[in-house]
């Protein structure tokens, strides 16, 4: 195909065998007649005539810019002009976005086409008109229509379920199924019988789009939030694209968008495929995009299994984070990989309940990554999070039992409570929603519409700083670290010295313990020796007592023997007592002799040392003389008394023989004795 300003002719199969060539879009200055190979021109090159610049069209001619009407073709549908005039030709889009079948006007009039017709879908208008939707029945043979290009303000074009042609995106962010508008118009897809959906092109600025699921979910559609949170309910589950001020659309099988400050979206609705279509095993979840100030989104759940004949595998697209900490949640049927881009102030990354791994990127002020709940039969997921500037807590992974999906809630860094359905957020507060997922799905990566923005830089403190400031700060930090290192080194040195001293003390204690052990062993040996000696002495005493008992038995004898031996024992005791007294008397005599000898020696010493004319000596000598005379008198008196007694005894015997003489003799004796004394 050569260069042209019109849209080329495309064709797509919707699951049936019959196909038809889709009409091309109108050129700038009109359309040309059909040709197999278009050359370089400014008009349309398909068989069907397209709208001209000013929207007027005749049979087989192009439509002018302002919608002039002419004759119509029999099978065509009238196209509207700029201000709503209806034409009868099957014209292509004009400069301001008239639909090809039918053409839309400037302010978004909508025309429909009958189900089962082979007319293609049109191109959106300037301000987001809604084009016709083609509904394919169970037995329809209508071919797939070409996807219309996105207008300036994001009109929605009709899409067919079985279309394989990617749709072009709008100016500020395309979506997975159809082009997106700037102010959030809505697209309504057509229900096809079977087929697969392709991935659309990435939008111009790349951070707002998301991809459609790779499977064949029933009637997937895209819900686009308006500028200030317009609420519109899409036909089926799809992917929502954020607007300029962050309306949030949370879709779970057909939920509507959330306005700017977190209004509750519409309830969910579920659509069923046609009777002749194959029902996929898993329905693709919706990829939600959070708002600017943290509108909360609902969680989307995917069934674990379906009872249809064909099975489709879905992949979960990435969710784009808001600026001030909204919460977006996605769910994948089975194992899927979801990459979340963090917001500016404490957003919570999207949580993916899947059997695969979930990677979350941390935010600037330390958000807590959402938890990943694994529900697969025999696999344990791994959650990886990139640390933030202020120390976010990494994600925690919980692996439940086989076939049992669990729900884990993870609040944001502002300590907002977590719920399992949806919760509105206020300011920088975010609420993490939990998602559950089914089993038996393969792991896929994010689509082309996902954001490719990497994590924020970890060195914001070096921004807008001069080299001197950086070097000064580094020098200050180095000095501080050196001081801390020296302090730590001093502590370590003190600890090392204590360890050395304690080691020496322990060595001394060990030596003392060893010596005490040796001493205790020696004492035990000596005690054993003493114990043996005591045992030996006890043995000898027992033997001596036994021998004494035998000796006493021999000496005492019987009772008669005891009586005979009594006097002998008494004599023996008396003899022993006499010997003892004799020994004591001998000792006493010896002691007295010794005392006398000592006294005499002392007297001699005293007598030798005294002078002859000493009065004391003379007195002693006189006294000694008196003592000697007294002793002599005593001795002679005793002798004389003995003689007198003897004489009296003799005289008594004599007086018995001679009477009368006794008295005279006695008197004479007494007189003589008295005279002698006188």
UniProtKB/Swiss-Prot annotation:
<feature type="compositionally biased region" description="Low complexity">
    <location>
        <begin position="209"/>
        <end position="226"/>
    </location>
</feature>
<dbReference type="InterPro" id="IPR025574">
    <property type="entry name" value="Nucleoporin_FG_rpt"/>
</dbReference>
<feature type="compositionally biased region" description="Polar residues">
    <location>
        <begin position="1"/>
        <end position="23"/>
    </location>
</feature>
<feature type="repeat" description="SXFG 4">
    <location>
        <begin position="94"/>
        <end position="97"/>
    </location>
</feature>
<feature type="repeat" description="PXFG 1">
    <location>
        <begin position="203"/>
        <end position="206"/>
    </location>
</feature>
<dbReference type="Pfam" id="PF05064">
    <property type="entry name" value="Nsp1_C"/>
</dbReference>
<keyword id="KW-0653">Protein transport</keyword>
<comment type="similarity">
    <text>Belongs to the nucleoporin NSP1/NUP62 family.</text>
</comment>
<keyword id="KW-0813">Transport</keyword>
<dbReference type="GO" id="GO:0006606">
    <property type="term" value="P:protein import into nucleus"/>
</dbReference>
<protein>
    <recommendedName>
        <fullName>Nucleoporin NSP1</fullName>
    </recommendedName>
</protein>
<feature type="compositionally biased region" description="Low complexity">
    <location>
        <begin position="324"/>
        <end position="446"/>
    </location>
</feature>
<keyword id="KW-0175">Coiled coil</keyword>
<keyword id="KW-0472">Membrane</keyword>
<feature type="repeat" description="SXFG 7">
    <location>
        <begin position="181"/>
        <end position="184"/>
    </location>
</feature>
<feature type="compositionally biased region" description="Polar residues">
    <location>
        <begin position="59"/>
        <end position="68"/>
    </location>
</feature>
<feature type="region of interest" description="Disordered">
    <location>
        <begin position="1"/>
        <end position="295"/>
    </location>
</feature>
<feature type="compositionally biased region" description="Low complexity">
    <location>
        <begin position="110"/>
        <end position="170"/>
    </location>
</feature>
<dbReference type="GO" id="GO:0005543">
    <property type="term" value="F:phospholipid binding"/>
</dbReference>
<dbReference type="GO" id="GO:0044613">
    <property type="term" value="C:nuclear pore central transport channel"/>
</dbReference>
<keyword id="KW-0677">Repeat</keyword>
<feature type="repeat" description="SXFG 1">
    <location>
        <begin position="52"/>
        <end position="55"/>
    </location>
</feature>
<feature type="compositionally biased region" description="Low complexity">
    <location>
        <begin position="246"/>
        <end position="295"/>
    </location>
</feature>
<dbReference type="Pfam" id="PF13634">
    <property type="entry name" value="Nucleoporin_FG"/>
</dbReference>
<comment type="function">
    <text>Functions as a component of the nuclear pore complex (NPC). NPC components, collectively referred to as nucleoporins (NUPs), can play the role of both NPC structural components and of docking or interaction partners for transiently associated nuclear transport factors. Active directional transport is assured by both, a Phe-Gly (FG) repeat affinity gradient for these transport factors across the NPC and a transport cofactor concentration gradient across the nuclear envelope (GSP1 and GSP2 GTPases associated predominantly with GTP in the nucleus, with GDP in the cytoplasm).</text>
</comment>
<feature type="repeat" description="SXFG 2">
    <location>
        <begin position="64"/>
        <end position="67"/>
    </location>
</feature>
<dbReference type="InterPro" id="IPR026010">
    <property type="entry name" value="NSP1/NUP62"/>
</dbReference>
<feature type="repeat" description="SXFG 5">
    <location>
        <begin position="125"/>
        <end position="128"/>
    </location>
</feature>
<dbReference type="GO" id="GO:0051028">
    <property type="term" value="P:mRNA transport"/>
</dbReference>
<keyword id="KW-0811">Translocation</keyword>
<feature type="compositionally biased region" description="Polar residues">
    <location>
        <begin position="38"/>
        <end position="52"/>
    </location>
</feature>
<dbReference type="GO" id="GO:0031965">
    <property type="term" value="C:nuclear membrane"/>
</dbReference>
<feature type="repeat" description="PXFG 3">
    <location>
        <begin position="322"/>
        <end position="325"/>
    </location>
</feature>
<feature type="region of interest" description="Disordered">
    <location>
        <begin position="324"/>
        <end position="461"/>
    </location>
</feature>
<feature type="repeat" description="PXFG 2">
    <location>
        <begin position="259"/>
        <end position="262"/>
    </location>
</feature>
<dbReference type="InterPro" id="IPR007758">
    <property type="entry name" value="Nucleoporin_NSP1_C"/>
</dbReference>
<feature type="compositionally biased region" description="Low complexity">
    <location>
        <begin position="69"/>
        <end position="96"/>
    </location>
</feature>
<keyword id="KW-0906">Nuclear pore complex</keyword>
<feature type="repeat" description="SXFG 3">
    <location>
        <begin position="81"/>
        <end position="84"/>
    </location>
</feature>
<feature type="compositionally biased region" description="Polar residues">
    <location>
        <begin position="174"/>
        <end position="183"/>
    </location>
</feature>
<dbReference type="GO" id="GO:0017056">
    <property type="term" value="F:structural constituent of nuclear pore"/>
</dbReference>
<dbReference type="GO" id="GO:0006405">
    <property type="term" value="P:RNA export from nucleus"/>
</dbReference>
């Amino acid at each position: 195909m050569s260069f042209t300003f019109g849209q080329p002719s495309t064709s797509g199969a919707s699951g049936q065998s019959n196909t038809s060539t889709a009409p091309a879009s109108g050129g700038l200055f009109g359309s040309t007649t059909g040709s197999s190979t278009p050359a370089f021109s400014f008009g349309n090159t398909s068989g069907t005539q397209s709208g001209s610049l000013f929207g007027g069209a005749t049979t087989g001619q192009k439509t002018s810019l302002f919608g002039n009407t002419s004759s119509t073709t029999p099978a065509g549908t009238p196209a509207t002009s700029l201000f709503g005039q209806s034409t009868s030709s099957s014209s292509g889009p004009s400069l301001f976005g008239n639909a090809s079948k039918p053409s839309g006007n400037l302010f978004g009039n909508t025309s429909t086409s009958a189900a089962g017709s082979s007319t293609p879908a049109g191109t959106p208008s300037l301000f987001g008109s809604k084009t016709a939707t083609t509904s394919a029945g169970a037995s329809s043979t209508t071919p797939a229509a070409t996807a219309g290009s996105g207008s300036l303000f994001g009109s929605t074009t009709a899409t067919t379920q079985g279309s394989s042609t990617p749709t072009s995106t709008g100016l500020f962010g395309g979506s997975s199924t159809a082009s997106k508008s700037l102010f959030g118009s809505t697209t309504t897809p057509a229900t096809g019988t079977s087929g697969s959906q392709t991935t659309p092109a990435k939008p111009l600025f790349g951070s707002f789009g998301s991809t459609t699921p790779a499977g064949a979910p029933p009637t997937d559609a895209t819900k686009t939030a308006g500028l200030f949170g317009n609420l519109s309910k899409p036909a089926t589950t799809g992917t929502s694209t954020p607007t300029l001020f962050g309306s949030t659309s949370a879709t779970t099988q057909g939920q509507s968008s959330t306005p700017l400050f977190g209004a509750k979206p519409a309830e969910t609705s579920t659509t069923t495929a046609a009777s002749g279509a194959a029902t996929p095993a898993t329905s693709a979840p919706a990829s939600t995009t959070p708002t600017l100030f943290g509108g909360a989104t609902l969680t989307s759940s995917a069934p674990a299994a379906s009872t249809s004949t064909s099975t489709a595998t879905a992949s979960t697209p990435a969710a784009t984070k808001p600026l001030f900490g909204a919460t977006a949640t996605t769910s994948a049927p089975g194992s899927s990989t979801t990459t979340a881009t963090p917001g500016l102030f404490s957003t919570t990354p999207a949580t993916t309940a899947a059997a695969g791994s979930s990677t979350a990127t941390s935010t600037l002020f330390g958000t807590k990554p959402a938890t990943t709940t694994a529900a697969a039969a025999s696999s344990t997921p791994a959650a990886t999070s990139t640390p933030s500037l202020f120390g976010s807590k990494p994600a925690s992974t919980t692996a439940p039992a086989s076939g049992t999906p669990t729900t884990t809630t993870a609040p944001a860094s502002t300590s907002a409570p977590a719920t399992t359905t949806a919760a509105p957020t206020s300011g920088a507060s975010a609420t993490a929603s939990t998602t559950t997922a089914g089993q038996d799905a393969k792991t896929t990566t994010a689509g082309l519409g996902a954001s490719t923005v990497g994590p924020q830089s970890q060195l914001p403190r070096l921004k807008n700083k001069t080299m001197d400031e950086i070097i000064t700060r580094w020098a200050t930090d180095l000095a501080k670290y050196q001081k801390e290192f020296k302090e730590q080194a001093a502590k370590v040195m003190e600890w090392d010295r204590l360890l050395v001293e304690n080691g020496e003390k322990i060595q001394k204690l060990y030596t003392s313990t060893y010596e005490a052990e040796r001493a205790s062993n020696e004492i035990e040996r000596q005690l054993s020796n003493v114990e043996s000696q005591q045992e030996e002495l006890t043995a000898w005493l027992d033997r001596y007592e036994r021998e004494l008992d035998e000796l006493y038995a021999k000496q005492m004898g019987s009772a008669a023997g005891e009586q005979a031996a009594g006097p002998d024992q008494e004599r023996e005791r008396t003899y022993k007592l006499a010997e003892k007294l004799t020994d004591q008397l001998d000792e006493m005599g010896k002691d007295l002799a010794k005392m006398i000898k000592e006294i005499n020696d002392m007297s001699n010493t005293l007598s030798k040392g005294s002078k002859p004319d000493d009065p004391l000596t003379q007195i002693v000598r006189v006294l000694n003389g008196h003592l000697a005379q007294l002793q002599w008198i005593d001795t002679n008196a005793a002798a004389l008394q003995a003689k007198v007694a003897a004489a009296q005894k003799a005289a008594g015997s004599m007086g018995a023989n001679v009477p009368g003489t006794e008295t005279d003799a006695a008197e004479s004796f007494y007189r003589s004795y008295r005279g002698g004394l006188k």
